[in-house]
């Protein structure tokens, strides 16, 4: 498919130009998202999504779409920010890309192959296209780098951590950071140290517990495979199952492929990894599709309860990303059995997808907040390379 462009917050006008701009790139396995911001990382001037493998043609198509939305912005790029999912144990904050940084990203790619490989490919294309400006890698893992040790350590033999670096990293950090920041603003001064749970629900899914803007727990772990049920990924699974499959003759590569690409909504429903198609099938009476949606909601709901307990209470629940933002049915299903915690949503507000869908002002607030990973990448690029 071709590019979808948007002029974002400031639509292009004839004769409009910007003196300097920041380009952001978010490369996935099958899509390339790009945006240009003003040089203060405050205003999105244009955005584009190319729905195909992010190769050289897709990259140039994205730039053309951005230029059409904000004439002059591409020639005015003064820095490029790249979303990189996994930075490993060494890259704990956004950083200017150097040969060493690139090598480090390559070294941890096997822990997030669906994400780091396209990011590295896009990084190479962008550095060739914009050789004279700083390139910044903004890591999804960075937001969780300072979690308490008890949230990071797995109860496995200690030498696994020392010898192989086994620990919890957490992912979708850029999304969780923005959502929690926006939730705190919506809560206002009523809560000076708010306890917030963020559910990032899309093709990839994760939850996090955030106290006063700092994450204290998250569902994804050493890799983006742990935690909630996802579009094609299983989420948390009894490790004994993997041992059983290996002893039964299934290869490591086959297990890797099936847990990453054939599980989750797709594997359970037998219909699709696309939540919308599974929902349609469930409404048409497909029992496996209904089971898949029930499992999806159950796992997300369990995470909310666990995180609220870990924080000693909850002030706000945030839904973000594709399913979280666009599915009133899934939001209602997740919250349905959490009324005992003070979580109640207004049905009409939920159907309209309003930002605040809370039913009672004195209860736990529930927000629907659009994901803005591009904005966070732009901010990190400004802070790291241009401040």
Residue ranges and their predicted role:
Residues 22-57:
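Short glycine-rich, Thr/Ser-proximal phosphate-binding strand/loop in the N-terminal lobe
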Residues 22-25, 77-81, 136, 196-200:
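Short glycine-aspartate micro-motif
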Residues 146-247:
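Glycine-rich phosphate-binding loop of actin/hexokinase-like ATP-binding domains
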Residues 248-292:
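A mobile "lid/hinge" subdomain adjacent to the ATP/sugar-phosphate binding pocket shared
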Residues 290, 294-315, 324-387:
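Internal helix-turn-beta structural module
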């Amino acid at each position: 498919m071709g590019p979808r462009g948007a002029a974002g917050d400031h639509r292009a006008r004839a004769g409009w130009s910007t003196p300097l701009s920041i380009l952001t790139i978010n490369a996935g396995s099958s899509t390339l998202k790009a945006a240009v911001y003003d040089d203060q990382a405050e205003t999105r001037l244009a955005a584009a999504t190319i729905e195909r493998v992010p190769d050289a043609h897709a990259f140039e198509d994205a730039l053309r779409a951005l230029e059409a939305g904000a004439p002059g912005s591409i020639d005015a790029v003064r820095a490029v920010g790249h979303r990189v999912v996994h930075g490993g144990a060494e890259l704990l904050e956004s950083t200017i890309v150097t040969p060493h940084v690139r090598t480090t990203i390559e070294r941890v790619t096997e822990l997030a192959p669906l994400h780091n490989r396209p990011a590295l490919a896009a990084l190479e294309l962008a550095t060739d296209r914009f050789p004279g400006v700083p390139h910044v890698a903004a890591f999804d893992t960075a937001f969780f780098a300072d979690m308490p040790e008890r949230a990071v350590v797995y109860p496995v033999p200690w030498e696994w951590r020392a010898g192989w670096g086994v620990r919890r990293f957490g992912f979708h950090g850029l999304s969780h950071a923005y959502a929690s920041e926006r939730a705190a603003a919506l809560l206002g001064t009523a809560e000076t140290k708010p306890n917030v749970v963020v559910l990032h629900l899309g093709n990839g899914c994760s939850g996090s517990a955030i106290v006063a803007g700092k994450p204290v727990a998250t569902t994804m772990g050493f890799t983006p495979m742990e935690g909630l049920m996802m579009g094609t990924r299983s989420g948390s699974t009894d490790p004994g199952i993997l041992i059983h499959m290996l002893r039964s003759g299934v290869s490591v590569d086959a297990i890797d492929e099936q847990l990453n690409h054939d599980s989750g909504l797709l594997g359970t429903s037998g219909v699709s990894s696309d939540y919308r198609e599974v929902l349609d099938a469930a409404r048409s009476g497909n029992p496996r599709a209904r089971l898949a949606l029930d499992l999806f909601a159950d796992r997300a709901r369990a995470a909310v309860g666990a995180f609220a307990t870990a924080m000693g209470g909850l002030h706000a629940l945030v839904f973000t990303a594709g399913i979280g933002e666009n599915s009133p049915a899934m939001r209602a299903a997740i919250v349905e059995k959490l009324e005992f915690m003070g979580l109640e949503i207004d049905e009409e507000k939920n159907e309209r997808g309003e930002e605040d869908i809370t039913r009672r002002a004195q209860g736990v607030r529930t927000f629907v907040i659009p994901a803005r990973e591009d904005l966070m990448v732009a901010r990190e690029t400004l802070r790291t390379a241009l401040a």
